[in-house]
Amino acid sequence: MNLVTIERHILEQQKFFPEASGELTDLLTDVAFAAKLVRREVVRAGLVDILGFAGTTNVQGEEVKKLDLFANEKIINAIGQHGRFAVMGSEENDGIIIPPKNETGNYALLFDPLDGSSNIDVNVSVGTIFSIYRLKGDDPGKASISDCLQQGSEQVAAGYVIYGSSVVMVYTTGNGVHGFTYDPTIGEFLLSHENIVTPKTGKYYSINEGSYAQFNEGTKKYLDYIKEEDPATGRPYSTRYIGSLVADFHRNLLTGGVFVYPPTTTHTNGKLRLMYEANPLAFICEQAGGRATDGRNRILDIQPTALHQRTPLYIGSEDDVIVAEEFEQGVR
């Protein structure tokens, strides 16, 4: 059996980019290392008193879990000390983070340290999501928020890590999507899903139907449609939703389906974060042959105006996303 580690695979991907300096390779390797640190604590969370709430709220106004803070700290410290990133942004921090030695970095990192952390106390899969951009300017010492507020189409790499029954890291550099499973016996991520291609249509839909009363008429009609009996179109679809975006997305990426987080009367602009969740997953989804929009516009074309900007999200198999969009737009 030919065992390919994530570090080796990242190095091999460099040949597709003749102009590559190797710096991005080091960045992705740093992210993989940080994921190992977070994974170590996630699997021990119930034993070392890092479950439950920390007693604070983040910039989103949400109660912060202890493990959120731990994961955030580990990622910042593990990645920010090497001088490869000039600026960073985290879902858990109000503003940008300027790491030590940033004057040598040429990239910006945006990340959600622990997506789905509300599930950690009940042992449901959680994950880390990340996104990498090249700096807009030539002077890393002057890196600013503008280097973070780039359209998703400017990403040079994106990925996520799922901490579940196994630990899986998925990433893209714009040349396909590849997945790696962590082998704890050797401490390495090994290639397990090469060149992931998501089905054009699926059989699952993922949405929080507990918010049905807050949905607009388009979303309600879509839900009625998706549940109707029609063998010709593969309906009804089955519901799969556990409230952990990265886990729901990963399942649909592999099996086919659509994840929908529409606007509601409570969150008229959507709830998910454009920079930390929607953009990186949209980049991955499109690279795997899928589609990602806010119901009307391509996610990767949205010009961000704030670090913690929110957005609706329709993401997954291309045909399924198009159908959901048509209901959102009132075409159906």
Swiss-Prot record:
Keywords: Calvin cycle, Carbohydrate metabolism, Cytoplasm, Hydrolase, Magnesium, Metal-binding. Mg(2+) 2 binds at residues 112, 115, 277. GO terms for molecular function: fructose 1,6-bisphosphate 1-phosphatase activity; magnesium ion binding. It is found in: Cytoplasm. Binds 2 magnesium ions per subunit. Its main location: cytoplasm. Pfam families: FBPase, FBPase_C. SUPFAM superfamilies: Carbohydrate phosphatase. Substrate binds at residues 115-118, 208, 241, 271. InterPro entries: FBPase_C_dom, FBPase_class-1, FBPase_N, FBPtase. Pathway: Carbohydrate biosynthesis; Calvin cycle. Its cofactor is Mg(2+). The keyword Ion transport does not apply. It catalyses: beta-D-fructose 1,6-bisphosphate + H2O = beta-D-fructose 6-phosphate + phosphate. One of its GO terms (cellular component) is cytosol. Mg(2+) 1 binds at residues 91, 112, 114. Its EC number is 3.1.3.11. One of its GO terms (biological process) is reductive pentose-phosphate cycle. It comes from the Bacteria. PANTHER family: FRUCTOSE-1,6-BISPHOSPHATASE-RELATED (PTHR11556), SEDOHEPTULOSE-1,7-BISPHOSPHATASE, CHLOROPLASTIC (PTHR11556:SF35). Belongs to the FBPase class 1 family. Homotetramer. This is Fructose-1,6-bisphosphatase class 1. It comes from Chlorobium limicola (strain DSM 245 / NBRC 103803 / 6330). The gene is fbp.
